[in-house]
Amino acid sequence: IAKALGLAVLASGGIYAAQRGVVDTFVQTTDASIVDFLGAVALAVLAFKGFTTITNSGGEIENPRKNVGRAIVISIAICIFIYLLVAAAVGTNLSIQEIVAARDYALAEAAKPAFGQYGLWITVGFAIIATVSGVIASVFAVSRMLAMLTDMELVPHSHFGMPGNIQKHTLVYTIVLAMTLTIFFDLSRIASLGVIFYLLMDIAIHWGVLNYLRKEISANRFILLTAITLDLIVLIAFIVVKVKADSIVIWTSLAGLFLIITAEKLYLSRKRK
């Protein structure tokens, strides 16, 4: 709540002190190709990944059949409102070149006319809150999911002498993996890797539901096929952009996929024996 309100206040201040109209901001034209645009959409998809934390916590939600879907719709609506507000604030005060130069501090720069130098400190403060809360939520959600997969004997597990239950172990593994990524990659590359793995995971889940669970859960075939198609379009465009701009991301993704698929196949084949 504090994160959303903070961003809304900063963005509102930026719009209040806008140097040009909000409507003009959203109708500006650029030289970007459709592939570049779709590549940017891929990163935007990652911005909405947080709602999967809700599904991963479904077992702890009261009346999950009703409230999980409702919570997802509400969270996406709030995100769209905040993101559009931030985009309007930044776009009405900064040029494309200024946005690129400001990078992570673009909102602070946009809010400067209204808040001055305090806008920077406010942005840093809310960025810390957003990062900490987001990391904690994601880490616990992922560790919970890994613990469930471990209980189902779908992924290997070793406690390495650690005390506690499986979820505490997977929590440690998740944090160690995240720390390893931050050592070898900057935030931009980590986000790019996240986009590729997330879209591939999304495609795999939709494909699995379409072929194995559609009748059991009464899933809509058209919606599943549409989701797979859109995911593929955005993923291919993002890969094309990254091949030209930062091929290390692609090679790292391929290596990661190879290791995961190989390890999982070996583990499952041994379990069957």
What spans do the regions from the language model cover?
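Helix-loop-helix connectors at the membrane interface of multi-pass transporters/channels
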Residues: 1, 6, 61-64, 73-78, ...
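Membrane-interface loop-to-helix entry segments
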Residues: 1-20, 31-32, 72-73, 195-204, ...
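Membrane-helix boundary/coupling elements in multi-pass transport proteins
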Residues: 48, 55-60, 119-157, 182, ...
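Transmembrane helix-loop boundary segments of multi-pass membrane transporters
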Residues: 1, 122-129, 180-204, 217-222, ...
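TM-loop-TM module centered on a large, flexible mid-protein loop between adjacent transmembrane helices
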Residues: 73-136, 154-187
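Helix-loop-helix junctions that connect adjacent transmembrane segments
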Residues: 1-120
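Hydrophobic core segments of alpha-helical transmembrane domains in multi-pass membrane transport
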Residues: 4-15, 86, 127-128, 174-183, ...
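A generic transmembrane alpha-helix motif of multi-pass inner-membrane proteins
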Residues: 12, 197, 211-214, 219-273
